[in-house]
Amino acid sequence: VKTGVSIWSSTDVLGSQCKKMLDAAAKALDVEVQYVDQGHVSEKVTASVEQLAAAGCQGIIICNSSDTEMTSAIKTCNDNKVYLAQFFRVISQENSKDIYDLATASPYYIGAVHENEPENGEKLVQILLDKGDRNIGLIGWEQGDATWLGRWEGYKAGVEKWNAEHPDDQAKLSEPQYAGTSSEGGSKAAEALMSADPTLDALIPAGGGGDPLQGAIAAVERAGKTQDIDIVSTDFLPDLGERLE
């Protein structure tokens, strides 16, 4: 049995951890695995499914970037009789009903494993609100990324809920600065947010694999604001504990 994996990167921190687990599972099950790194570039995401189907994979697991890519991915798998599942992603029944219906009607689309991103976002922003932070700067990674949009929805919901319950103690969430997935991008985004608003008291580097968080922390340190700005994130590198000591 041969399984294809369409992933943003099999070599960055999060991707390499995923690869390690998939390789261990494949070894235990005596399955061959083929990886294609697509960088969450839409054309490469859809091409990766075609490439893996052409390589003779009987099944493909994919971490796509946006729901729209799944139209092509599902069609390719239907045409080639290849099973398809998503990881870290799910098609939104609310926002992408046509694609959701296409998936549920397909005999080859078998489902998704994913986090509850809006809940993740709401809980994360609540940590800041409970600490007394009221002026929160937001750092996204890629515009339109499904996971990012889910987390952002949660941050906004958390702030709206707080403001409804605390009319005399309002919080605000900035429009996002986008960092990509690099440390440098995180650093520049944090600097832009701090210079745009000197009263900023919190930052959320929403994700992107952990490197943007490192960059944001470095920018806050350089600005001498480690006592003034709290930072929370969902994605972090394995050595973050040592980095913060």
Report residues per predicted region.
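A residue-level marker of the well-folded mature domains of exported/periplasmic proteins
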Residues: V1-E245
